[in-house]
């Protein structure tokens, strides 16, 4: 009989040779598959320390065993049972699974115990031996007195990380989802122990992006409000550029942000507080701020009449086009031959579609004309009511004074 390739890793310990084995007994070992059935052979197994000795007959000295297996090459010992099998043999099988590390040559071992109780006893004993073998490898690690263990995170070099300022697109996205007055909170956090020689380029770029985004946001909102209250003829003259000063023609240049002292590690400031820290421009009035304080411009009396004239001209033009298209379609229908050709049918469909669209446009213009006429009548009615209200108030005052005189 030749011995297995997996032997001991080192010289045997004297304590292991003199100590009594943990467990001994006869079990059946799986030796392969034959032509018709599996081959199982009785073997005498001795568990001593972290070594497993297997021999064909009972021996007093473990050195005479045919096979020696080092349990440090194995990962676990567990029960081996088929789920759908009812055979008593399958209730007593257990296996030693080898480690899956590269270079391991130990084979997987399968045993069959005499009874399920004996199987549980072998599994517990082999599992404890495998654990001791793994711990023995760890206990063999020695540390010299001169060497020391460095802390992996505490002793490494510190690297200063500078925070990147928010981009312009991010500021616009945050401002669009903020409250109606445009206030948004910016988290200005400075890193600990900033280097004194670091330039203030980040702060300057942050100030430029912030001022541009705020000016564009405020201008777009106020421009929308002014478009709703001002007529179309005055929109071009009323719009002013938010980045230009009203008193000077030169464009406004944003100022750099103040550098916070090192004592302020982190600070949460609002947009209003940041803009109030500007030194060079303490008072910067804008045309847009003046437009906010002005009352809404009332509609001009002639505006409604101009709209009515425009609607009337559009209605007349639409009706002329509709009549022209209808005449063209009637002429084609009269001059058309009895057999239809595909181009004639397509042109006829195009004329019908054009006629339908012009008819819808004509009805829409007519409806707009009626609505404007009703608006004009309502405006005249409100004017008459406003004129009659002071006269009725005077009459009530005179009647009240006459009633008081009669009482006196």
Swiss-Prot record:
The modification Phosphoserine is found at residues 226, 270, 341. C-terminal fragments could be released during apoptosis via caspase-3-dependent cleavage. Its main location: membrane. The keyword Transport does not apply. One of its GO terms (cellular component) is nucleus. It is found in: Cell membrane; Nucleus; Cytoplasm. The record marks 154, 156 as: Interacts with capping protein. Residues 132-192 are annotated as: Interaction with capping proteins (CPs). Residues 20-131 form the PH domain. Residues 1-21, 217-264, 325-348, 389-408 are annotated as: Disordered. Residues 229-240, 389-401 have a biased composition (Polar residues). SMART domains: PH. GO terms for biological process: lamellipodium morphogenesis; myoblast fusion; myoblast migration; regulation of cell shape. It is a peripheral membrane protein. Keywords: Cell membrane, Cytoplasm, Membrane, Nucleus, Phosphoprotein, Tumor suppressor. Residues 307-408 are annotated as: Negative regulator of AP-1 activity. Heterodimer or homodimer. Interacts with CK2 and actin capping subunits (capping protein CP-alpha and CP-beta). CKIP1 and CK2 together inhibit the activity of actin capping protein at the barbed ends of actin filaments. Interacts with ATM, IFP35, JUN, JUND, NMI and PI3K. Interacts with AKT1, AKT2 and AKT3 (each isozyme of PKB), PtdIns(3,5)P2, PtdIns(4,5)P2 and PtdIns(3,4,5)P2. PANTHER family: PH DOMAIN-CONTAINING PROTEIN (PTHR15871), PLECKSTRIN HOMOLOGY DOMAIN-CONTAINING FAMILY O MEMBER 1 (PTHR15871:SF1). Plays a role in the regulation of the actin cytoskeleton through its interactions with actin capping protein (CP). May function to target CK2 to the plasma membrane thereby serving as an adapter to facilitate the phosphorylation of CP by protein kinase 2 (CK2). Appears to target ATM to the plasma membrane. Appears to also inhibit tumor cell growth by inhibiting AKT-mediated cell-survival. This is Pleckstrin homology domain-containing family O member 1. The gene is Plekho1.
């Amino acid at each position: 009989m030749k011995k297995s390739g997996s032997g001991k890793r080192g010289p045997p310990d004297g304590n292991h040779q003199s100590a009594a084995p943990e467990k001994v007994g006869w079990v059946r070992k799986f030796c392969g598959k034959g032509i018709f059935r599996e081959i199982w052979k009785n073997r005498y197994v001795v568990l001593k320390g972290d070594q497993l000795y297997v021999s064909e007959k009972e021996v007093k000295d473990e050195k005479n065993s045919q096979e020696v297996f080092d349990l440090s090459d194995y990962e676990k010992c567990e029960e081996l049972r088929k789920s759908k099998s009812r055979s008593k043999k399958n209730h007593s099988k257990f296996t030693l699974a080898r480690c899956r590390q590269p270079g391991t040559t130990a084979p997987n071992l399968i045993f069959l115990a005499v009874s399920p109780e004996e199987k549980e006893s072998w599994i517990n004993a082999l599992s404890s031996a495998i654990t001791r073998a793994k711990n023995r490898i760890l206990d063999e690690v020695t540390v010299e007195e001169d060497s020391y263990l460095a802390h992996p995170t505490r002793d490494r070099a510190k690297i200063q990380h500078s925070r990147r300022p928010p981009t312009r697109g991010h500021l616009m996205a945050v401002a669009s989802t903020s409250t109606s007055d445009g206030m948004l909170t910016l988290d200005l956090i400075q890193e600990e122990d900033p280097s004194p020689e670091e330039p203030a380029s980040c702060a300057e770029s942050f100030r430029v992006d912030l001022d541009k985004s705020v000016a564009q946001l405020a201008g777009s909102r106020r421009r929308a409000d002014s478009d709703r209250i001002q007529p179309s003829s005055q929109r071009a003259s009323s719009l002013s550029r938010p980045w230009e000063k009203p008193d000077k023609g030169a464009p406004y240049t944003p100022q750099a942000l103040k550098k916070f002292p090192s004592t302020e590690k982190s600070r949460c400031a609002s947009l209003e507080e940041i803009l109030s820290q500007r030194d060079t421009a303490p008072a910067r009035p804008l045309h847009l701020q003046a437009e906010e304080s002005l009352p809404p411009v009332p509609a001009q009396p002639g505006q409604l009449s101009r709209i009515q004239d425009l609607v009337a001209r559009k209605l007349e033009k639409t009706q002329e086009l509709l009549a022209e298209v209808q005449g063209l379609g009637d002429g084609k229908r009269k001059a058309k031959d009895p057999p239809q050709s595909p181009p004639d049918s397509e042109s006829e469909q195009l004329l019908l579609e054009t006629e339908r669209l012009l008819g819808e446009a004509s009805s829409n213009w007519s409806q707009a004309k009626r609505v404007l006429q009703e608006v004009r009548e309502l405006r005249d009615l409100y004017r008459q009511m406003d004129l009659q209200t002071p006269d009725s108030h005077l009459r009530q005052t005179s009647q009240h004074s006459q009633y008081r005189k009669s009482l006196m």
